[in-house]
């Protein structure tokens, strides 16, 4: 099973990092999430510097991001939220391929040595200085306020009127 193999590669890569704590959250409803949860559960039971949470809730999640050293995985959160906290992301595999991301994101394959080397890079003073200058490609906070302001200025007419067309089915 590729999902199990990839999960084990990640866990093997971080196992040697005994001087750090690792927080895991349950994966989304993707295919194979049960395998990922099972493997992480086993790993957390054997490694007292690792913790697994089903869900942290938004406030706790953002607090963890703020006080973390970075993110490792293939979550869109690493591409979307982490740049706002000026933290690096190690994006593993192809799951987020094709998405826009900032220079605080380092893409790697599911390879133990590559992941370990990238963890070390993520923590270097040089990389940390570099990402302080980076802005998220997704813009700045406050988009919803701007959208509401623009919509209030626009005159929107006939939004409830639907136009139908007869289609010849013969």
PLM-predicted stretches and their roles:
Residues 1-170:
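Nucleotide-activated sugar donor-binding and catalytic core shared by glycosyltransferases
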């Amino acid at each position: 099973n590729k999902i199990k193999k990839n999960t084990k590669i990640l866990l093997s890569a971080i196992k040697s990092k005994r001087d750090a704590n690792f927080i895991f959250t349950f994966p989304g409803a993707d295919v194979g999430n049960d395998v990922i949860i099972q493997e992480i559960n086993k790993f957390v039971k054997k490694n007292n510097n690792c913790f697994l949470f089903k869900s942290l809730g938004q406030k706790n999640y953002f607090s963890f991001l703020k006080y973390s050293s970075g993110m490792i995985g293939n979550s869109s959160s690493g591409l979307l939220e982490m740049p706002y906290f000026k933290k690096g992301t190690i994006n593993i595999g192809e799951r987020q391929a094709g998405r826009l991301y900032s220079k605080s994101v380092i893409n790697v394959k599911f390879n133990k040595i590559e992941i370990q080397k990238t963890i070390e890079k993520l923590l270097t003073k040089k990389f940390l200085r570099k990402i302080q200058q980076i802005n998220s490609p997704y813009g700045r906070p406050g988009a919803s306020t701007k959208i509401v302001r623009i919509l209030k200025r626009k005159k929107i007419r006939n939004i409830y009127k639907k136009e139908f067309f007869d289609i010849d089915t013969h």
